[in-house]
Amino acid sequence: MEVKAIHRGARISAQKTRLVADQIRGLPIERALNVLTFSPKKAAGIVKKVVESAIANAEHNEGADIDELKVKSIYVDKATSLKRFTARAKGRGNRIEKQTCHITVTLGN
C-alpha cells in the first residue's frame, strides 16, 4: 500500500528543500517527524506539513495503521520562478527570481 501527498508551488528553493528531504528518506514515520520537528531549517516545517498530510491520507482513505508506515520516497522538483525586479542606480533594474518547488512524499510499508 502506498499513500501520496503533493505540495505544489512551495515558496522555497528546491536545492534547500532537498537537504531536508534527504534526511528523512527511508525513515519510519515517528522518527521522520522527530527529525523535522527539531530541524532549524525553514524547509523542515514545509516538508513536515506534507508528511502529516500523507499520514492523514493514509488514515482516512486507506485505513492504514500509521505505526507501520515509513517514508518510502520523497523527492523535490523545481517549479516555476516568480520574476521580480529591484531598482538599481541610474534608472536600471536587476531581475530577482524567487524560486518555487514541488514536494512529493510517498508513504508505504
UniProtKB/Swiss-Prot annotation:
For this protein, the record's NCBIfam families field holds: rplV_bact
What Gene3D superfamilies would the database entry show? Ribosomal protein L22/L17
Describe the function of this protein. This protein binds specifically to 23S rRNA; its binding is stimulated by other ribosomal proteins, e.g. L4, L17, and L20. It is important during the early stages of 50S assembly. It makes multiple contacts with different domains of the 23S rRNA in the assembled 50S subunit and ribosome.
Signal peptide positions (record): none
What family is this? Belongs to the universal ribosomal protein uL22 family.
- Assembly information from the UniProt record: Part of the 50S ribosomal subunit.
Originating gene: rplV
Species of origin reads Cupriavidus taiwanensis (strain DSM 17343 / BCRC 17206 / CCUG 44338 / CIP 107171 / LMG 19424 / R1) (Ralstonia taiwanensis (strain LMG 19424))
Keywords, A to Z, come to: Ribonucleoprotein, Ribosomal protein, RNA-binding, rRNA-binding
**Any one Gene Ontology cellular component term annotated for this protein:** cytosolic large ribosomal subunit
Q: Which pairs of positions does the record mark as disulfide bonds?
A: none
What is the name attached to this protein's record? Large ribosomal subunit protein uL22
Q: Name one GO biological process term.
A: translation
**UniProt xrefs under Pfam families:** Ribosomal_L22
Q: Which GO terms describe its molecular function?
A: rRNA binding; structural constituent of ribosome
Record's CDD domains? Ribosomal_L22
